[in-house]
Amino acid sequence: KPPSGTLPNQMNVSGFLGNGLVNTYFRGDRTTGTLTSPEFTIQRKRIAFLIGGGRHPGKTCIELHVDGRVVRTATGQNNELLQWRGWDVAEFGERTARIRIVDQVTGGWGHINIDHIGQTDQRQVGTPPPPALDPWTQYVQVLLGSNEFMFVR
């Protein structure tokens, strides 16, 4: 069963939706591991998700794998507040992919929090994620780079 929020001895985790999330703080920052999704087909222009936790690029992160290689990655911001982030994946349309959540850090902020991963075609400023992501909150999109974006509440 996924964690329902904040784990013992962890700062307050917020910003996730529903009753659970991926939270690798289990038994503190000393635990490590990966979680890999089943294969899926990229059917939309973007993949959006909520992310929080440690900022260790390549070590506490979420990755998109296409054809067996990492093509997109994102990391937390050393904060327990999960925020909307995502990737432009239009170039990978109709290809098979996997999501991998990585925690390979045992020190401070050695964990990652992920929730509500989904595919969407939305990108314009002020456009909310699709209803499955959260129809009750208005989002503004902030571009972070050519292939990454963030929704800000």
Predicted segments, located by residue:
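Extracellular glycan-recognition surfaces and repeat-rich motifs
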Residues: 1-21
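Short beta-strands within extracellular/lumenal beta-sheet-rich domains
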Residues: 19-44, 56-59, 82-87
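Beta-strand cores of secreted/periplasmic/IMS beta-sandwich domains, seen most often
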Residues: 39-51, 99
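Active-site-proximal structural scaffolding
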Residues: 42, 57, 80, 92, ...
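Beta-strand acidic-aromatic groove motif in beta-rich domains, primarily in extracellular
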Residues: 47-48, 52, 57-64, 110-114
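Extracellular carbohydrate recognition and processing domains
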Residues: 64-112, 121-127
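Substrate/cofactor-recognition hotspot
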Residues: 123-153
